[in-house]
């Protein structure tokens, strides 16, 4: 079993139970899924850019991403409905815990001038969103093979009802929030 999941079951659950006075273990918030989305705007002119993004996302997440397509046509961006413009991955279960562990312990500390992630990025329903400016912070990405620096959005979906509960859950799991 993953070390982060073990930590969740042995330390985080009892801590949250006592802090929020839950009656049942099933009320304790947990991470449901992590969605990683990479928008590739230049895929409109350059089809190879999307292939590279898909490949990098597969390396980072450990599973094959799904290609996202444009919902609407936008003439200003020379975009037609149905054109591929990005890639996303939804992680659950073991892979999700592995990715979160890697993100918190390896990748985020590698960000330049890192002072912690924003406390304001909760959506009011207990989910947390985080933007990463470059894919190079992940250890799987080989610096020499990168042809373009791409960012991504990482959404951590929890079963928490409020932002306060979600913040406490993520803090106990090791998320480095700003002081």
Curated annotation (Swiss-Prot):
Any one Gene Ontology cellular component term annotated for this protein: ribonucleoprotein complex
| Record-linked InterPro entries | Ribosomal_uL5 (IPR002132), Ribosomal_uL5_bac-type (IPR020930), Ribosomal_uL5_C (IPR031309), Ribosomal_uL5_CS (IPR020929), Ribosomal_uL5_dom_sf (IPR022803), Ribosomal_uL5_N (IPR031310)
What are the disulfide bonds? none
For this UniProt entry, the molecular function terms from Gene Ontology, in alphabetical order, are: rRNA binding; structural constituent of ribosome; tRNA binding
Which biological process annotations from GO are given for this protein?
translation
Q: So which domain of life are we looking at?
A: Bacteria
The subunit structure is: Part of the 50S ribosomal subunit; part of the 5S rRNA/L5/L18/L25 subcomplex. Contacts the 5S rRNA and the P site tRNA. Forms a bridge to the 30S subunit in the 70S ribosome.
The text of the family note is: Belongs to the universal ribosomal protein uL5 family.
What task does this protein carry out? This is one of the proteins that bind and probably mediate the attachment of the 5S RNA into the large ribosomal subunit, where it forms part of the central protuberance. In the 70S ribosome it contacts protein S13 of the 30S subunit (bridge B1b), connecting the 2 subunits; this bridge is implicated in subunit movement. Contacts the P site tRNA; the 5S rRNA and some of its associated proteins might help stabilize positioning of ribosome-bound tRNAs.
The name of this protein is Large ribosomal subunit protein uL5
Q: To which species is this protein native?
A: Anoxybacillus flavithermus (strain DSM 21510 / WK1)
Please state the gene responsible for encoding this protein: rplE
